[in-house]
């Protein structure tokens, strides 16, 4: 019986086929990982807002129904600026309030530059375990803030500490909270709506 000669050209072709398959699979895995990393950012932000994880404060729509508790707590106010020519300070460095009482405090911002600038504040509270109980009704941190050259503005924060904090054994004995803000620059501010009858001076307007 005559042995058929082996076509050696088939071997590298089969190897190239396997390499192409492996490369395709690796590319798909990388694409999925990149997509997952982008999806993880909004999910992480949502998770923090929903649970108070990592000291993320909550957003309330109204004052608590229950009356304030006799127990009081000290709230300290911290302010920072990163990458903006702004002076940013709290009008009070700390206050003592009953748990459950709605309070309004003010921060002052001055744009020290000679041109308009826009920023938005990131925020958290310490210790991190109280994030779920620190309820903001109104805050300048909810939106971008644009300041004209040299402009100074007082900006309110309306908040309360949820009375449920008093029943949390993890925060038993807690007597102080620090609310911290850091303003960061907004490179591409959201365009402001133009009122009816006013010319639109934005770039590209007809």
From Swiss-Prot:
SUPFAM superfamilies: Ctag/Cox11. InterPro entries: CtaG/Cox11_dom_sf (IPR023471), Cyt_c_oxidase_assmbl_CtaG (IPR007533). Keywords: Cell inner membrane, Cell membrane, Copper, Membrane, Signal-anchor, Transmembrane, Transmembrane helix. Residues 1-22 are cytoplasmic. Residues 44-206 are periplasmic. GO terms for molecular function: copper ion binding. It is a single-pass type II membrane protein. It is found in: Cell inner membrane. GO terms for cellular component: plasma membrane. The chain crosses the membrane at residues 23-43. NCBIfam families: PRK05089.1. Belongs to the COX11/CtaG family. PANTHER family: CYTOCHROME C OXIDASE ASSEMBLY PROTEIN COX11, MITOCHONDRIAL-RELATED, CYTOCHROME C OXIDASE ASSEMBLY PROTEIN COX11-RELATED. This is Cytochrome c oxidase assembly protein CtaG. The gene is ctaG.
